[in-house]
Design a protein with these regions (language model features):
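Short beta-strand micro-motifs enriched in acidic
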Residues: 66, 123-127, 206-210
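Glycine-rich phosphate-binding loop of ATP-grasp-fold ATP-dependent ligases
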Residues: 26-28, 47-88
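Protein kinase-like catalytic core scaffold
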Residues: 47, 133, 214-216
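A long amphipathic alpha-helix within ATP-dependent nucleotide-binding catalytic cores
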Residues: 96-108, 144-206
């Protein structure tokens, strides 16, 4: 049986919101329109708009209301544009935004490592017993001049411990990793109720300045190869064994 893939970010978000335990980790995410953009900016001040379907951080745009409400700006790729009014901001966004379904998501103030933003990828797979297991957690450090952390968009793969060492001690890191593993498994269980043929997921998790984790989105075709960069080679080897068991056609070298 083929592994189930779910393209729509919003569809997956709606499933997570049905869980009382998980909804507190999901930032507000709604369909992008002129009206929702304005109301979300008024409420949160900083947002990300992104395609409902897509990978590698392509098409993600950061939108902000400037301090004292003196204007707006957005960043797409490495380009930053500033506007004096909401109308001109929206016009500018429509000129650069691909004409397909977009979402608007509450912006999270990410933790930084050497002045660069980072987030985490939590890999979750069905193990050899058919149970969900968090098999790896790795950090992704953003390119200095970009807003996304994806490796394919210039991000740097970095161990969790390296990124978090200046924010918490070793004992706190161990507890935090366990918390992320639990969130990963809970997310997989919740999604598999609606999508029973899922076998693997990758959670993109932001950590805010209060150290709260946020599930930015869930990828149902996660890239395991980034974990080959970890010094503990057993992590990737376990991922490969699990993938071979639930999908012999899923070649993970």
């Amino acid at each position: 049986m083929a592994i189930q893939r779910v393209v729509s970010k919003q569809a997956k978000t709606q499933v997570l919101l049905q869980s009382e335990e998980l909804r507190g980790y999901v930032p507000e995410t709604i369909i992008y329109t002129r009206q929702t953009l304005r109301s979300m900016l008024d409420q949160h001040g900083m947002l990300y708009i992104k395609p409902d379907s897509g990978t590698f951080g392509n098409g993600v745009i950061k939108v902000e209301q400037l301090s004292n409400k003196l204007g707006y700006r957005f960043q797409s790729g490495t380009k930053i544009r500033t506007y004096k009014s909401f109308d001109s901001l929206f016009t500018g966004l429509e000129q650069v935004r691909p004409k397909r379904r977009y979402l608007v998501q509450k912006g999270i103030q990410l933790l930084k490592h050497h002045k660069r933003r980072f987030d985490l990828r939590v890999m979750v797979q069905q193990n050899l017993s058919g149970q969900w297991e968090s098999t790896g957690i790795i950090g992704r450090l953003s390119h200095p001049s970009k807003i996304v952390t994806n490796y394919h968009s210039g991000g740097t793969i970095t161990p969790f411990e390296t990124l978090m060492s200046s924010h918490m001690n070793a004992d706190a890191q161990a507890k935090y990793l366990e918390k992320l593993r639990r969130i990963g498994v809970k997310t997989a269980i919740q999604l598999s109720v609606r999508y029973p043929n899922l076998k693997e997921i990758g959670l993109d998790v932001a950590v805010d300045t209060d150290l709260k984790p946020w599930i930015l989105e869930v990828n149902t075709m996660p890239d395991p190869y980034i974990f080959r960069r970890l010094s503990d080679k057993g992590i990737f080897q376990r991922m490969r064994r699990y993938a071979a068991a639930y999908s012999p056609k899923r070649v993970v070298k």
